[in-house]
Amino acid sequence: MDQTLDATGSIGALPGTGHSRSPLKAREQWLFDLVATEPDLTLAEIRARLRVEKKLKVGTTSVWRFYNCHETTFKKTLHAAEQDRPDVAAARAARKAEQASLKAPRLVFIDETSVTTKMVRHYGRCPVGERLVAKVPHGHWKTMTFIAGLRIDGMTAPYVIDGSMDGPSFLAYVEQVLAPTLHDGDIVFMDNLRTHKVDGVAAAIKAAGASVRYLPAYSPDLNPIEMVFVKLKAALRKDAARTVEALWKLIGKLIKTIAPDECANYFRHAGYKA
């Protein structure tokens, strides 16, 4: 310490003389190839592979730091394996090829999702060693179906049905809620489901001057309203409404927060011009 004080005028530690080289640097390409062929390996599994296959002992933090420095993050989006079936793949390719020619202001994407009076966030925080317990209804709750359309500039024709969706309920929605909002030349896209094909649905849409097209099977990624539902359900879990009336009011409030720019972003993300 006396020598440091004499030399620098300070008793602080001397600055480092250089940057230590990571032992993973020599295995860089191997690490890239590993996650390219097995992308869902955990840090612990990669660490174990290094030890067995490369005789290299490192900590999981070192493995994380290596991939983080090379902008390789841990993530995964799940798509239906059925998308690889020849008939489904052909239908998806045809729909994607058509996307650029569609006029976004004329498009209306319809879908429905279930909502309940027992929705709650699935995770939270508490001290280590303690359990985080949340109370939700287990014996009595209500399940409803929220159905709506998405246009380039906002939500349209929102409606809540008591219980699950069936053919007669969907037909009533189309005739009484959706059809009055349609204009000449509109194209209504919806999932290729039996309940969406009951007698009267296509006729009601056609009578309003619009046409109906069904999305390819196993293709939620081609329906931009799916992203709205993800946001909606996250907000519903946050507020955790416990009565039917409170849930209705909350859905109505959340619909108003979906801005036009946000809708356009959803269209673009699904591959449509906006």
What are these regions (language model features)?
Residues 1-274:
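Short functional hotspots at interaction and active-site rims
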